[in-house]
Amino acid sequence: MHNEMVLDAANAATIRLVNASWSNYLQRACRNLHSIGQLCRGDGAEILLRRLKRTRPSTYGHSIRVAKFSRATGRAFGFDDARLKQLGQAAVFHDIGKILVPEVVLNRPRKPTPTEMFVLHKHPTFGAMLASFFDLPAELRIRTQYHHERWDGKGYPEGLAGKDIPLMARIVQVADTYDAMVATDRPYRKAHTHAEAIAELLREAGTQFDPHVIEAFIDTFPEEEKAN
């Protein structure tokens, strides 16, 4: 018990230290990326995606898959082509903030520590900061920032609830969670089957997820997949 209390205190102290120094770190990192970007050809969006693909290839692949699932769900909601394009962009950029998360934190072969989880939970805010530094549309910044909010208000970074969370962010959240469950094994968790992942989404409908988004998401799969 004493050792656990010491570890908890150490983690809390580390989190305070990280929080105190993180703003300066992020400002420097964003400025450096922006300076590099000004030397590259292409607009801010292209620069950020190239950086994500080069430095975080698994996150990039995940983002492309999330965009596919999100657009399919948007079609189920009756989105027109313009809104589908916006939704696809929001999905592709949803994890762009992980560019600023140290690679050692992203690739730990075990469950993250409380301090590492604290840093990971900052990535939506990092994404919004990057979008701002690179002059991406304000709507994209908002959708990037809120994809980890929860329907019941217990998410992050701002604890938004229900329809206060932008619909596109709610859609991306479901697609993001599904792909994270089925895509790959992790050292501390085996990949889910499609049926297992759908069952988990249904369990969390109305708490973590918008139940209408869950319904639309499931409807995008062929009937034979829904039964498996």
Which positions does each model-derived feature cover?
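Histidine- and acidic-residue-rich, metal-dependent catalytic cores
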Residues: D8, R16-N228
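His/Asp/Glu-rich acidic catalytic environments and adjacent acidic regulatory segments
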Residues: A12
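N-terminal acidic, proline/glycine-rich, low-complexity intrinsically disordered segments
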Residues: M1-A9
